[in-house]
Regions:
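Non-catalytic cap/lid and distal C-terminal segments of serine-dependent acyl enzymes
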Residues: 1-115
């Protein structure tokens, strides 16, 4: 649920949070309510960054449909892919600390480093 609270933090406090690293975002909570929330509360593009990823195994395999909808919301809000937001599908990864540990460098580089 860390990804969902990170989205909320950027949307509610855009002057405090400049980005969110959303790893294995559990979009299905509330039957996609978070997508509706994002659509109505996303901050203006250009000053904020969002990173999303999801695997293809275990519960992560349920996220792609939701993530594609989130990508449309970001694009329609004026966010530029690979600049303001990045979404990565990671084959063979599951919803686990081991999988996240293997890829934690990707959101860190995108959000605070040179991607």
């Amino acid at each position: 649920m860390g990804a969902l609270i990170s989205i909320y933090a950027v949307c509610e406090y855009p002057d405090v949070f400049g980005g969110a690293g959303c790893v294995s975002t559990h979009w299905p909570v509330g039957e996609g309510y978070v997508l509706q929330y994002l659509q109505h509360h996303i901050p203006a593009p250009g000053e904020h960054k969002f990173y999303f990823d999801y695997g293809t195994e275990t519960v992560d395999s349920l996220y792609e449909t939701f993530q594609l909808k989130a990508d449309v919301i970001l694009r329609e809000a004026g966010y530029t892919e690979s600049v303001d937001w990045l979404t990565i599908k990671i084959e063979g990864h599951e919803h686990s600390e081991r999988a996240w540990r293997e890829r934690v460098h990707i959101p860190l580089e995108f959000l605070i480093g040179q991607y």
